[in-house]
A protein has these predicted regions:
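Solenoid-like repeat scaffolds
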Residues: 21-22, 81-82, 117-122, 151-157, ...
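Start-of-helix register in tetratricopeptide repeats
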Residues: 28, 87, 91, 127-128, ...
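Amphipathic helix-loop-helix modules that constitute alpha-helical solenoid scaffolds
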Residues: 1-117
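Residue-level signature for tetratricopeptide repeat
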Residues: 36, 62, 99-103, 135-136, ...
Length: 208
C-alpha cells in the first residue's frame, strides 16, 4: 500500500539524516539523502486513484512536494561542489534535473544522458545502461535506444523493466508484433499488479 511505501521512505530519510550528521562533509551521503528526498517528493503522483503506476512524464507535477525538492536540490548542489562525484550524487543529479523541469517537455535529456554516461563509468551495470536508453530515445529516437539495449538482453531477460522499455521503443517504431511480444513478456515478469496493469495499458493501445 502507498502508506507502507511512504512510511518506509520516511524511515530511510530519517536514517540518512542521522548518517549525514555523523559525516557532515561526505558528499556521497549528501547525494544519498538528496536522492531519497527527490524520489519521495513524487510519491503522491506515482499512482492514480485506481492504484495504477503513472510514468514520470505523465505525473501531475503540482502534487510533487516542493519543500523536499528544494532541500534535495540544495544538498546535491553542495555535494557536487566537493568535486568528488560518486554514484549517489550522479543519481541525485539526474533526479534533480527531472525535478527542475516545470513540464515533462522541459526536461534536459541531453544533460541526463551525459549523467547516465558518467554513472556508467562510476558504477557500470546493465540497468544503468537501460535507464540511459530512455534518455537516448528522447534525444536520438527509439531506433538508437534499441541498438543500445540489444546487448543487454542476455543479462536482463528476466527483468520486467527491460521488456517494458523495449516494448515501448518497438511500439514507437510501429513494430507492433514485436512490441506485443515484449509487453507480454513484461507482464509475465511483473512483480506487482500495478506493474502488470501499466504494461497492459500499452498492450491494449496497440493496433491489431
Amino acid at each position: 500500500p502507498a502508506s507502507d511505501r511512504a512510511s518506509l521512505c520516511d524511515e530511510a530519510i530519517r536514517l540518512a539524516r542521522l548518517l549525514l550528521r555523523m559525516y557532515p562533509s561526505e558528499p556521497e551521503i549528501m547525494g544519498l539523502l538528496a536522492l531519497m528526498l527527490l524520489q519521495h517528493s513524487r510519491i503522491a503522483a506515482r499512482f492514480d486513484a485506481q492504484g495504477n503506476a503513472v510514468l514520470l512524464e505523465d505525473q501531475d507535477r503540482g502534487q510533487w512536494k516542493r519543500p523536499l525538492i528544494q532541500e534535495g536540490l540544495a544538498l546535491i548542489d553542495k555535494a557536487l561542489r566537493s568535486r568528488r562525484p560518486g554514484p549517489y550524487q550522479i543519481q541525485a543529479a539526474i533526479a534533480g534535473l527531472h525535478a527542475r523541469a516545470a513540464r515533462a517537455d522541459d526536461t534536459d535529456w541531453a544533460e541526463i544522458d551525459g549523467l547516465y554516461q558518467a554513472l556508467e563509468r562510476h558504477a557500470p551495470s546493465p540497468v544503468v545502461t537501460l535507464n540511459r536508453s530512455v534518455a537516448l530515445a528522447k534525444l536520438s529516437g527509439p531506433e538508437a535506444a534499441l541498438d543500445l539495449i540489444a546487448p543487454l538482453a542476455p543479462r536482463l531477460d528476466g527483468y520486467f523493466y527491460f521488456h517494458g522499455v523495449r516494448g515501448s521503443f518497438l511500439k514507437q517504431l510501429g513494430r507492433n508484433a514485436e512490441a506485443r511480444e515484449a509487453f507480454n513478456r513484461a507482464i509475465a515478469l511483473a512483480n506487482t499488479p500495478a506493474e502488470a496493469a501499466h504494461i497492459r495499458q500499452h498492450l491494449d493501445s496497440l493496433s491489431a
